[in-house]
Protein backbone atom coordinates (compact mmCIF):
# COMPACT_ATOMS: atom_id res chain seq x y z
CA UNK A 1 0.00 0.00 0.00
CA UNK A 2 1.09 3.54 -0.66
CA UNK A 3 -0.19 7.02 -1.20
CA UNK A 4 -1.63 7.27 -4.73
CA UNK A 5 -1.28 10.90 -5.70
CA UNK A 6 -1.46 14.45 -4.43
CA UNK A 7 -5.17 15.18 -3.96
CA UNK A 8 -4.92 18.86 -3.04
CA UNK A 9 -3.04 21.49 -1.08
CA UNK A 10 -4.99 23.19 1.72
CA UNK A 11 -4.24 26.84 2.47
CA UNK A 12 -5.54 28.58 5.60
CA UNK A 13 -6.84 32.08 4.86
CA UNK A 14 -8.49 34.78 6.95
CA UNK A 15 -11.03 35.70 4.28
CA UNK A 16 -12.30 33.87 1.20
CA UNK A 17 -13.74 37.19 0.06
CA UNK A 18 -10.17 38.50 -0.23
CA UNK A 19 -8.37 35.27 -1.13
CA UNK A 20 -10.74 33.89 -3.79
CA UNK A 21 -10.08 36.75 -6.27
CA UNK A 22 -6.34 36.52 -5.58
CA UNK A 23 -6.23 32.79 -6.37
CA UNK A 24 -8.58 33.23 -9.33
CA UNK A 25 -6.06 35.68 -10.81
CA UNK A 26 -3.15 33.38 -9.92
CA UNK A 27 -4.64 30.13 -11.22
CA UNK A 28 -6.59 31.69 -14.07
CA UNK A 29 -10.04 30.34 -13.23
CA UNK A 30 -12.72 30.85 -10.58
CA UNK A 31 -13.29 28.36 -7.77
CA UNK A 32 -15.29 25.38 -8.97
CA UNK A 33 -16.81 24.77 -5.57
CA UNK A 34 -17.48 26.46 -2.25
CA UNK A 35 -18.55 24.31 0.67
CA UNK A 36 -19.22 24.62 4.38
CA UNK A 37 -17.72 21.81 6.47
CA UNK A 38 -19.69 22.27 9.67
CA UNK A 39 -17.83 19.56 11.61
CA UNK A 40 -14.53 21.41 11.06
CA UNK A 41 -15.95 24.95 11.42
CA UNK A 42 -14.68 26.05 8.01
CA UNK A 43 -15.84 27.24 4.63
CA UNK A 44 -13.74 26.04 1.72
CA UNK A 45 -13.18 27.17 -1.86
CA UNK A 46 -11.67 24.74 -4.36
CA UNK A 47 -9.68 25.73 -7.44
CA UNK A 48 -8.37 23.37 -10.09
CA UNK A 49 -5.87 23.71 -12.90
CA UNK A 50 -5.24 20.46 -14.74
CA UNK A 51 -4.79 17.78 -12.09
CA UNK A 52 -3.75 20.31 -9.42
CA UNK A 53 -6.32 21.31 -6.78
CA UNK A 54 -6.01 24.05 -4.18
CA UNK A 55 -8.37 24.29 -1.22
CA UNK A 56 -8.70 27.61 0.61
CA UNK A 57 -10.03 27.28 4.16
CA UNK A 58 -11.64 30.11 6.16
CA UNK A 59 -12.57 29.55 9.82
CA UNK A 60 -16.17 30.06 10.88
CA UNK A 61 -15.35 29.83 14.59
CA UNK A 62 -12.40 30.96 16.71
CA UNK A 63 -12.32 27.37 18.04
CA UNK A 64 -11.64 25.81 14.63
CA UNK A 65 -8.27 24.28 13.80
CA UNK A 66 -7.90 26.81 10.96
CA UNK A 67 -8.47 29.81 13.28
CA UNK A 68 -5.92 28.43 15.74
CA UNK A 69 -3.45 27.73 12.91
CA UNK A 70 -3.74 31.30 11.58
CA UNK A 71 -3.43 32.77 15.08
CA UNK A 72 -0.22 30.82 15.69
CA UNK A 73 1.39 30.81 12.23
CA UNK A 74 -0.51 33.25 10.03
CA UNK A 75 -2.08 32.45 6.69
CA UNK A 76 -0.41 29.80 4.57
CA UNK A 77 -0.16 26.13 3.68
CA UNK A 78 -2.10 24.12 6.26
CA UNK A 79 -2.02 20.63 4.77
CA UNK A 80 -1.12 18.47 1.81
CA UNK A 81 -3.72 15.80 1.05
CA UNK A 82 -3.00 12.52 -0.69
CA UNK A 83 -5.50 10.13 -2.27
CA UNK A 84 -5.48 6.53 -1.06
CA UNK A 85 -7.36 3.37 -2.02
CA UNK A 86 -8.20 2.29 1.55
CA UNK A 87 -8.03 5.01 4.19
CA UNK A 88 -8.34 2.66 7.18
CA UNK A 89 -5.52 0.44 5.93
CA UNK A 90 -3.40 3.50 5.18
CA UNK A 91 -4.04 4.92 8.66
CA UNK A 92 -2.92 1.61 10.18
CA UNK A 93 0.21 1.54 7.99
CA UNK A 94 1.14 5.10 8.93
CA UNK A 95 0.51 4.46 12.63
CA UNK A 96 2.71 1.34 12.50
CA UNK A 97 5.38 3.42 10.76
CA UNK A 98 5.49 5.79 13.75
CA UNK A 99 3.30 8.66 12.57
CA UNK A 100 0.92 10.26 15.06
CA UNK A 101 -2.66 10.45 13.78
CA UNK A 102 -4.88 13.32 14.91
CA UNK A 103 -8.01 11.20 14.54
CA UNK A 104 -8.35 7.50 15.28
CA UNK A 105 -11.09 6.97 12.69
CA UNK A 106 -11.60 8.56 9.28
CA UNK A 107 -13.89 11.59 9.37
CA UNK A 108 -15.80 13.44 6.67
CA UNK A 109 -14.08 16.42 5.13
CA UNK A 110 -14.84 18.56 2.09
CA UNK A 111 -16.42 16.78 -0.89
CA UNK A 112 -17.78 14.26 1.65
CA UNK A 113 -14.42 12.52 1.40
CA UNK A 114 -13.06 10.59 4.34
CA UNK A 115 -9.95 12.22 5.80
CA UNK A 116 -7.35 11.67 8.47
CA UNK A 117 -4.82 14.24 9.60
CA UNK A 118 -1.30 13.47 10.80
CA UNK A 119 0.25 15.46 13.63
CA UNK A 120 2.54 18.12 12.10
CA UNK A 121 5.44 17.07 14.32
CA UNK A 122 5.24 13.60 12.73
CA UNK A 123 5.90 15.09 9.30
CA UNK A 124 8.38 17.87 10.09
CA UNK A 125 5.59 20.40 9.59
List where the protein language model places each region:
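Short Pro/Gly-enriched beta-strand edge/turn motifs at strand-loop
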Residues: 25-32, 99-102
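N-terminal beta-strand motif that seeds the catalytic metal site of vicinal oxygen chelate
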Residues: 1-20, 75-84
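The feature marks the first
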Residues: 5-7, 17, 27-30, 51
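Conserved short beta-strand elements that form part of the metal-binding/catalytic scaffold
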Residues: 30-71, 111-125
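Long, charged/polar, surface-exposed segments that mediate recognition or autoinhibition
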Residues: 73-74, 87-92
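Conserved active-site tyrosine of GNAT-family acetyltransferases
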Residues: 19-24, 47, 94
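Vicinal oxygen chelate
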Residues: 2, 45-46, 82, 91-125
Amino acid sequence: MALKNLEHIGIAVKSLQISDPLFEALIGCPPYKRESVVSENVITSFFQSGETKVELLEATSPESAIAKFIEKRGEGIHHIAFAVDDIKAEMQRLKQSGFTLLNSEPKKGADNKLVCFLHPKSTNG
